[in-house]
Amino acid sequence: MAAAAAAGAGPEMVRGQVFDVGPRYTNLSYIGEGAYGMVCSAYDNVNKVRVAIKKISPFEHQTYCQRTLREIKILLRFRHENIIGINDIIRAPTIEQMKDVYIVQDLMETDLYKLLKTQHLSNDHICYFLYQILRGLKYIHSANVLHRDLKPSNLLLNTTCDLKICDFGLARVADPDHDHTGFLTEYVATRWYRAPEIMLNSKGYTKSIDIWSVGCILAEMLSNRPIFPGKHYLDQLNHILGILGSPSQEDLNCIINLKARNYLLSLPHKNKVPWNRLFPNADSKALDLLDKMLTFNPHKRIEVEQALAHPYLEQYYDPSDEPVAEAPFKFDMELDDLPKEKLKELIFEETARFQPGYRS
């Protein structure tokens, strides 16, 4: 048995990094590098399939601990075909020895970012990918969670065109009552997929910010290039207004922050660019849905259930096969304020269920 043979050999090395995942996981192969760890594929000697293993070493930084804990907490509670799951977590048996955490997930061949660099998508593919994104997002939003970092590289794909949403490190519980903030506070998610209200007066605590990101992703699938590639966040806003045109008086009224509102009023008037001029070969129904997702005013932006029911997705739409979460998700405490030592304890507890001999 390969596992037994490998057991005595000590941990495997990948590109100078220790990958201590034996004896169950062997035959490691490098896939890529994330912000705080390496991803490899490996052979799972129990289930007899290849899997992806992400090595995370977050414990030096409060922010990395926070993101790791958020991702683990959410993914262990979510169960959905269009959301990546966690199959196993490997870590040291004691908190003192725990320097790294290895997260085992289904192996997906590629992601939408890589695919769009090399392939022009047919309308059928665009429609099917968009449907799966929204089907996953319906479940996420039904749990009262916001992803807050939807972008092509966070959409995993395999050769049969199954799509899974990944990377919940920036996710939050929706909190519309605490959404208001000052003008242009730095926000962590990738700028190009950021809703305009985040640059203006919102913390991004409402579900509509994810819908905006999905609109940006749809536009990118239609043209193989990002629709709003801003260089900094004022530039980002200018890109958006350059296509959507100047906001109406009604849309300006929903911007509570006066500094932000006055900034918009100071800009020269811009007309909306028709979608069919930007995407002359696109399906007209796709452009109608795009228009409803890329709406400046978050209160008028389409919601995920309405988007699924849009005529563009008619061939796939089936509310009885678009499951929702059993209960809304709750973080027992706000993680932002906890020191990294406390976060490490919480990660240790959260991963205990995968330890040999675990009793809950």
UniProtKB/Swiss-Prot annotation:
The UniProt entry, under Pfam families, shows:
Pkinase
SMART domains named among the record's database cross-references:
S_TKc
Q: Which residues carry this modification: Phosphotyrosine?
A: 187
Its predominant location is nucleus
Biological process (GO) annotations held by this record are: apoptotic process; cell surface receptor signaling pathway; cellular response to hypoxia; intracellular signal transduction; negative regulation of acetyl-CoA biosynthetic process from pyruvate; peptidyl-serine phosphorylation; peptidyl-threonine phosphorylation; positive regulation of protein targeting to mitochondrion
- Which positions, given as ranges, span the membrane? none
The domain of life is: Eukaryota
Q: Does the keyword Cell cycle apply?
A: yes
> N-acetylalanine occurs at which residues?
2
Question: What are the alphabetically sorted keywords of the record?
Answer: Acetylation, Apoptosis, ATP-binding, Cell cycle, Cell junction, Cytoplasm, Cytoskeleton, Kinase, Membrane, Nucleotide-binding, Nucleus, Phosphoprotein, Serine/threonine-protein kinase, Transferase, Ubl conjugation
- Similarity remark: Belongs to the protein kinase superfamily. CMGC Ser/Thr protein kinase family. MAP kinase subfamily.
Domain description from the entry? The TXY motif contains the threonine and tyrosine residues whose phosphorylation activates the MAP kinases.
Q: What does this protein do?
A: Serine/threonine kinase which acts as an essential component of the MAP kinase signal transduction pathway. MAPK1/ERK2 and MAPK3/ERK1 are the 2 MAPKs which play an important role in the MAPK/ERK cascade. They participate also in a signaling cascade initiated by activated KIT and KITLG/SCF. Depending on the cellular context, the MAPK/ERK cascade mediates diverse biological functions such as cell growth, adhesion, survival and differentiation through the regulation of transcription, translation, cytoskeletal rearrangements.
Q: Which PANTHER family match?
A: MITOGEN-ACTIVATED PROTEIN KINASE (PTHR24055)
Q: What do we know about how this protein assembles, alone or with others?
A: Binds both upstream activators and downstream substrates in multimolecular complexes. Interacts with ADAM15, ARHGEF2, ARRB2, DAPK1 (via death domain), HSF4, IER3, IPO7, MKNK2, MORG1, NISCH, PEA15, SGK1, and isoform 1 of NEK2. Interacts (via phosphorylated form) with TPR (via C-terminal region and phosphorylated form); the interaction requires dimerization of MAPK1/ERK2 and increases following EGF stimulation. Interacts with MAP2K1. Interacts with DUSP6.
This protein is called Mitogen-activated protein kinase 1
Q: Which organism is it from?
A: Bos taurus
Q: What is the lineage of its organism?
A: Eukaryota, Metazoa, Chordata, Craniata, Vertebrata
